[in-house]
Structure formats: C-alpha cells, structure tokens
C-alpha cells in the first residue's frame, strides 16, 4: 500500500522519532510546513528517553587531547567511563583511527566553538518550548553543577569553564563546603563545584511525549512502531518502504534515526561513520537525594532528580549493536556515584536501562543536505536533547532557503578532521 504523505503539498517525511526527529517535525509545523514522523520504536530503548536528563550548553566533545594517553586503559579496564572492549571489527578500527585524529588541541577548540554556538541556539529555544508545552515538558532552568573530588578534576573543570566563558555562558564557583551547605547530600570528599547557570534538567521521556502531543495538535502525523527498511528516490519525490509493507512518500525527507541512520544514509547519497556507544542509567529512590542536577567530574556520571526518583546515568561502551546490560558497567556507574553521594548505598533501585548513542569519530553531529530534497541530522552522541532544537533550526532554515551560518558548515555530511 502506498501512503502519499505528500498529499499535503509541503509535507516532509522524517525518519526517526527520537528527540531530534521530533524537534525537526515540531519546527517544520511551527513554520507552516507539514510533517510525518516514522518512529521505529520501541520507546524503552531510545537514548532520547533514557539519557541523563540534562541540557548542558557548551558540553565538550568526546574526542579531546586528554583521551589518547588513556587509550590502553580504556580498552583493558572495564571501570573506565569510556570503555572499548577489544573485538574484531574493521568499522570500529577505522572509527578509532579517525577518532584519534580528532583528539588534537586545534580540533577540540573548533569543536567547542561549534557545539557552543549550536547549543546556544538550542538553549534559547528551550525557554520558548517550556512556555509552549507547559509543565508536561518538565523543563526546569535550575542549572547543572560540575562537581569534583581531586585536584586533577578541578583543573579539568576549570579549563572547560574558561571555554564556557569565552562562549558567553555564565558559571558560579563553589567550594566543597559551600556546595554541602546548599545541598547536604554531597560527600565530605567533594572539593568544589562549578554551577552552569544555563543548564536545565528534565525528564527526557516526558519531554518526548509532550513534543509528540504538540506535533499532533499542530497537524503533524506520527507513525509508531514503523521501521523504515529502504529509501529510494523517484520522479515524484522520496519513498520509504516500511516493515508493515507500506510505502510512505513525500517530496522532501529528513533522516534522523540516530545510530540506525548508518544503514540508510547511503540511499540519500551520504556516508556517515558512527559507532553505537552504549549508555546506562539506574533509577533510584533515595532519601535526602540531591536537589540539583550534577555531573560528577572524575567518573563522568550524571545525577538528575526526576520527581521522587534520582537518575544516575553515564558510561560509553563501544561494544557494537546490542542492548545487553553489562552488570560490571552498572556496578561501575553506581560506584562512581557513591564516592560523591554516600546515601546511594541505602537507595532502592527502581529500574535499570541501556541504550545506544550515535557517536561520530569527529565528536560533531552530521547536519545538512543529502541528495536533492533530502537532509540528515544524526551523530549527536550524548547531546541529542541539548542540541535538538538548534539542529532543527539549521535543517528547516536550509530547507526554506535561508543561508547557513559559516560556523555550521563543518557539520555538513562528509566533514572530516
């Protein structure tokens, strides 16, 4: 059966129902175009719903000059925040070589500038989104703290803070004692913190649900449990063959399927080299939990209050396309958090989760045009929620013929270090 999604003249077909695809659909509808979202699901494995729940403008890219000296440690130590278990994989080897090329001071500086500009666009739009969606979006502009226990962690945090100031983001520094005065949950071993004033926290699943609801209210269409198996271009536009046997068609198409974009990108004339980076979270019921979202500097763990529960999230595990929960990684996650929050030892575990983040070797997302009438938006790594509104703006501006900013050109398909 063929469904003519282009029956509405300016309707756009969006492959991918994570936060990036949803925000593109929302932006299209707000600017007078139509949108049909094809969402493969299921919800419970989506990194858009299981991430740390923090909007972190100016967050650094994964490749940095600090990574290469730790490379062997990352491969051999299962407790490393970025763990790369050795396995025979030519795509992984190529990715690692390209990743190593990205771990230079010059590329890090350029990436920080680009991610900072993109996240600034997003942050401004989150304020408007919070007003539009109301309490259902759970967007709380309460700031996010960066907390450390070691002198090395402090130096690392202060270097990133310098970058944030250059990019125009505000911060507030606290001693460990000041932090504990504000929030007694933190350990006596904590030496200090920086509060990122532009940070926000949220329940990412609730945000996705609120945006989905708004898409429907604006006249958009959302197909759930609808996996796209192939894409082709015909004389009348783009056609997506789905697992249900239906063919969805439209004059324009956006591929925003996260790590699953790899297999479809060639159909729109784009090559994207990504690796699935598995992340984990635990949901806890913890007495006297911290009240502000935080990133724990040394173990690279995110802590986010979500209603009566606390989300503990983190780790990057390059172990291929699978959703196997690795107990050792969960233990590492909780041990890292417990060093900062002693009360976690008596917390009740309510849920555990893992999902696959789409990570490029460059550390930058891929945002731009494919073959005529097609666009791609993927590779956001851990920053899908943070960068989604800005990504949607770049895609829709380009679709409507508005000039792209010079700094965003490095995000186009085919960019290399």
Predicted regions: what they are:
Residues 8-10, 243-252:
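Core beta-strand elements of the Rossmann-like FAD/NAD(P) dinucleotide-binding domain
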Residues 10-37:
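N-terminal Rossmann-like FAD-binding beta1-loop-alpha1 element of flavoenzymes
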Residues 30-50:
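Glycine-rich FAD pyrophosphate-binding loop
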Residues 40, 51-55, 59, 63-102, ...:
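Active-site substrate-recognition segment that forms the wall
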Residues 94-213:
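Rossmann-like flavin
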Residues 174-182, 200, 224-238:
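A conserved short coil-to-beta-strand element within the FAD-binding core of flavoproteins
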Residues 298, 341-417:
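C-terminal catalytic lobe of FAD-dependent flavoproteins
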């Amino acid at each position: 059966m063929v469904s003519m999604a282009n029956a509405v003249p300016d309707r756009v077909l969006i492959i991918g129902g994570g936060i990036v695809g949803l925000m593109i659909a929302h932006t299209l509808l707000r600017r007078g175009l139509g949108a049909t979202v094809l969402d493969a699901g299921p919800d419970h494995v989506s990194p858009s719903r299981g991430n740390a729940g923090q909007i972190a403008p100016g967050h650094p890219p994964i490749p940095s000059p600090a990574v290469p000296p730790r490379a062997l440690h990352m491969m051999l130590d299962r407790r490393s925040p970025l763990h790369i278990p050795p396995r025979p994989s030519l795509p992984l080897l190529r990715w690692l070589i390209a990743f190593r090329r990205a771990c230079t001071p010059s590329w890090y500086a350029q990436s920080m500038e680009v991610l900072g500009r993109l996240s600034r666009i997003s942050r401004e739009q989150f304020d408007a989104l919070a007003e539009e969606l109301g309490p259902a979006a759970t967007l709380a502009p309460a700031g996010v703290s960066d907390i450390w226990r070691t002198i090395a962690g402090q130096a690392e945090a202060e270097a990133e803070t310098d970058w944030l100031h250059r990019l125009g983001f505000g911060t507030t520094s606290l001693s460990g004692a000041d932090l504990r005065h504000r929030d007694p949950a933190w350990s006596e071993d904590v030496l200090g913190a920086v509060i990122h004033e532009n940070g926000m926290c949220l329940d990412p699943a609730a945000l996705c649900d609120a945006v989905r609801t708004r898409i429907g209210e604006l006249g958009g269409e959302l197909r759930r449990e609808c996996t796209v198996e192939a894409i082709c271009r015909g004389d009348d536009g783009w056609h997506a063959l789905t697992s249900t046997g239906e063919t969805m068609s439209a004059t324009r198409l956006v591929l925003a399927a996260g790590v699953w974009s790899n297999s479809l990108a060639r159909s729109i004339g784009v090559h994207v080299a990504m690796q699935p980076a598995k992340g984990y979270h635990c949901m806890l019921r913890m007495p006297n939990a911290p009240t502000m979202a935080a990133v724990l500097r040394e173990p690279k763990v995110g802590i986010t209050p979500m209603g009566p529960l606390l989300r503990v999230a983190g780790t990057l595990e390059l172990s291929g396309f699978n959703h196997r929960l690795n107990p050792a990684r969960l233990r590492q996650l909780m041990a890292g958090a417990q060093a900062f929050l002693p009360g976690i030892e008596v917390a009740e575990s309510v849920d555990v989760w893992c999902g696959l983040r789409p990570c490029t070797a460059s550390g930058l997302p891929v945002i731009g045009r494919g073959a005529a009438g097609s666009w791609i938006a993927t590779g956001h790594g851990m920053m899908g929620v943070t960068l989604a509104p800005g990504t949607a703006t770049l895609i829709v501006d380009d679709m409507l013929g508005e000039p792209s900013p010079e700094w965003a050109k490095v995000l186009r398909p085919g960019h290399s270090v």
